[in-house]
Amino acid sequence: MRIKWKNGLSIEYKGNRVVFDAQSRILNCKVSFVTHAHTDHSYSFRLNHIPVISSEETMRLISIEGAKTRKWQPLTVNEKVKIGDLEVIPHPSGHILGSYEFEVCTPHGVVLFTGDLNTREGRIVKPAEPIRCDVLIIEATYGSPEFIFPSDREVGDEMIRWAYKVLGENKIPVFQADAIGNSQEIIRIFNENTNMPVISHWRVSKVNKVYEHYGHKIKYIDINSGEASEVISSANTVIVSPKKLDLPSNHRFVSAIVSGWALKFRGAAFPLSDHADFPSLLNFIRDCSPKIVLTYHGGAFNEILAKYIEKKMGIKSYPANLTPITFPI
């Protein structure tokens, strides 16, 4: 079995090659698997020359932006896909609606590719499942010891307190977050703990509708509705919008960033994250009991996490992009 990182994860066994979260056009490959709908993982939905496999939820979320491969195939949790002697099995990754980690089984060993990972119990998505494996390929977005998140309950309480403070100044709080994932969590925080109406940007509203289709109750008002205009005039609401979106040029709106990176920000920012923090990554690795750990998707943190794993956990580890590996070694 040969494992290689080059614009996505490639696993090859006896001439059958599959790719996970491809980031560019791929050749000589049987199938491309997509872990979830965020754009930095879902390039494969632009491809039409090979089958592209994901959850149905992922396909629906990606379709919001108009991207849809003609060769998409659905895959449900624990359903097995055979490609020669490779067997691929999806499990929940805990990140966003429909997100998967992929277990790849061969006669010579088991690989687990996490995609984006969250091991905490969310308000909407089930947490990631540790799977015993020989080779673990794990994301390192927050793969450095300084990233220790407070509990989601603590963060939610802080967000509510901040929102009431802003409203008390006769201004409107705006939470800026990823349109898929964190935005729905924010809306649920206010739905479950306040009577405050929540207005969502139209891009967030499109995502909300997909979540609702799969049975997740989210109460919101679309920003383009007449009702939203009335509620904004009353100054008793919060707004949820995508990150990096310019607000109207008046002083009535006060924005806060919602992201794990908030631990590094000054000003109004809240570390609500759909990724695992550093201790959670280590716990997940321990529970998977791998012989080798490859780190990815963390930039400089790939090496920081890999060195920590080797030194503190005694497991061979290095960044996935450094060199291909053949397993068994």
What kind of feature is each model-predicted range?
Residues 52-56, 70-76, 194-202, 313-322:
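Short hydrophobic/aromatic-enriched beta-strand-loop microsegments
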Residues 1-27, 31-33, 37-174, 181, ...:
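His/Asp/Glu-rich metal-coordinating catalytic cores
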Residues 157-234:
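Hard-cation-handling environments
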Residues 64-69, 189-190, 210-216, 303-314:
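Short, aromatic/basic amphipathic alpha-helical patches
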Residues 95-97, 176-185, 297-303:
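Gly/Ser/Thr-rich loops at beta-strand to alpha-helix junctions
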Residues 50-60, 137, 196-207, 293-297:
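Short internal beta-strands
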Residues 7, 215, 222-329:
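C-terminal regulatory/interaction regions
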Residues 105, 129, 188-196, 308-315:
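Short, surface-exposed basic-aromatic patches at helix termini and helix-loop junctions that form
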